[in-house]
Amino acid sequence: MLTYALVALGSAIGGTLRYWLSMVIAEASAGTFPWATLVINVAGSAAIGLFATLTSVDGRVFVPSEWRTFFMVGICGGFTTFSSFSLQTLALAQDGDWLAAGLNVVGSVALCLLAVWLGHVAATIINR
């Protein structure tokens, strides 16, 4: 039960950080390129990579498993799910499974873009 509470708290923190940072970046940048999303996804990926490695079995920092979950699933997940995707893809590549890593990248991007488009089409039909 504690782990669920930690994930919920971490998600709230991560989501709040994402919203705040996206507002800061949006004010600082101009144009239509999604700078805030890019920066947040890259920052979240860097954070989960750093934390996962530092707190792994071979890492220099001991963190109980529920606190790893709090940060990696809760905060990073609330901040961006792209961080989990990046960590999982890195794990595939490090295991030498380059085909699976590549398919994960291409498949995720293609399927997510398709899903966004299908959702848009469905909403457009509903809105008529």
Swiss-Prot record:
Chain ranges passing through the membrane: 5-25, 32-52, 70-90, 106-126
Reported regulation of activity: Na(+) is not transported, but it plays an essential structural role and its presence is essential for fluoride channel function.
InterPro entries given in the database record: FluC
Superkingdom of origin organism: Bacteria
Signal sequence extent: none
Known role: Fluoride-specific ion channel. Important for reducing fluoride concentration in the cell, thus reducing its toxicity.
GO function terms (MF aspect): fluoride channel activity; metal ion binding
Name of the protein this chain belongs to: Fluoride-specific ion channel FluC
Annotated Pfam families: CRCB
The family this protein is said to belong to: Belongs to the fluoride channel Fluc/FEX (TC 1.A.43) family.
Membrane topology: Multi-pass membrane protein
